[in-house]
Curated annotation (Swiss-Prot):
Stored SUPFAM superfamilies: RPB6/omega subunit-like (SSF63562)
Organism: Methylorubrum populi (strain ATCC BAA-705 / NCIMB 13946 / BJ001) (Methylobacterium populi)
UniProt name for this protein: DNA-directed RNA polymerase subunit omega
Gene name linked to the record: rpoZ
Role this protein plays: Promotes RNA polymerase assembly. Latches the N- and C-terminal regions of the beta' subunit thereby facilitating its interaction with the beta and alpha subunits.
Spans traversing the lipid bilayer: none
Biased composition regions of type Low complexity, renumbered to the chain: 90-102
Basic and acidic residues bias locations: 103-120
Region (Disordered): 90-136
Length: 136
């Protein structure tokens, strides 16, 4: 039974290896609960999948797209590119908007706090008070 089915399918999908990939993918879909497009006739899922491909009740191109989609781990989404903002000129207005130079950044120092100081500070924090606005 399956041999005749494979010979019917070779006319639809010329590459035997691709046929095996598509039929096995369709058989897995059938096992997962996909609806049948042909009568089962007590056949197993791989034979039903081959019969569906041979009878062209499901197209090989659709199966190929589904197979590719199922194997993708990352689906690339086309997003519009961010617009580039032109650089500001060296006008007085631009100087007022421009950030300070990096030499000023070198003078900034951060306070160091030990873990004990941090824990004491967290213990001294009061819990937030509940307000009547929460129900609104």
């Amino acid at each position: 039974m399956a041999r005749v089915t494979v010979e019917d399918c070779i006319e639809k999908v010329e590459n035997r290896f691709e046929l095996v990939l598509l039929a096995s993918h369709r058989a897995r879909l059938l096992a997962a609960g996909a609806p049948l497009t042909v009568e089962r006739d007590r056949d197993k899922n791989p034979v039903v999948a081959l019969r569906e491909i041979g009878d062209e009740t499901i197209t090989a191109e659709d199966l190929k797209e589904q197979l590719i989609h199922s194997m993708q781990k990352y689906v690339e989404v086309d997003e519009p590119e961010a617009e580039t903002v032109p650089l500001l000129s060296s006008s007085p207005a631009a100087a007022a908007v421009a950030p300070q130079s990096s030499s000023d950044d070198k003078d900034v120092q951060f306070d160091r706090m030990s873990e004990e100081d941090l824990l004491r500070g967290l213990e001294n924090l009061a819990p937030p008070t509940e307000t009547d606005d929460e129900g609104e």
